[in-house]
């Protein structure tokens, strides 16, 4: 590799009603020795709704979303949907294409503890060979 440039754009919208939309788009421009200049790209868009109305506060100084703080004693349930795509086909490089759709439910027990279940479907396409995979993921997360 003679060099590479990465460009990214990220956005978040979060409101008091518990709704939020988050997205990111990334492009990598690579000057490869054998393959010349190639471009790879990817993005995701995520939507969520906290059923009890909580939201993630946004810190404009640091450009980060704060932690969700459950109001009630029993925490805060959150419905989540996400679509993501990565395209690694460019010029002579055929790295493939990946697409994924996820639907999930998170339960924020406290500001630090989250339990989540996500069901997803993944589509892969490389060298004209296509595949589909279904997934179910669970996560117990502690945020320090």
What spans do the regions from the language model cover?
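Outer-membrane beta-barrel pore domains
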Residues: 1-144
């Amino acid at each position: 590799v003679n060099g590479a440039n990465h460009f990214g754009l990220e956005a978040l919208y979060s409101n008091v009603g518990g709704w939020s939309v988050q997205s990111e788009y990334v492009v990598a421009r690579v000057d490869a020795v054998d393959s010349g200049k190639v471009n790879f790209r990817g993005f995701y868009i995520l939507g969520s709704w906290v059923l009890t109305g909580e939201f993630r506060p946004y810190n404009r100084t640091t450009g980060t979303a704060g932690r969700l703080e459950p109001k009630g004693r029993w925490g805060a349930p959150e419905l989540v949907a996400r679509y993501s795509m990565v395209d690694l086909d460019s010029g002579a490089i055929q790295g493939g294409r990946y697409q994924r759709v996820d639907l999930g439910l998170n339960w924020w027990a406290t500001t630090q503890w989250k339990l989540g279940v996500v069901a997803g479907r993944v589509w892969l396409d490389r060298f004209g060979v296509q595949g589909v995979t279904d997934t179910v993921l669970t996560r117990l997360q502690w945020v320090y």
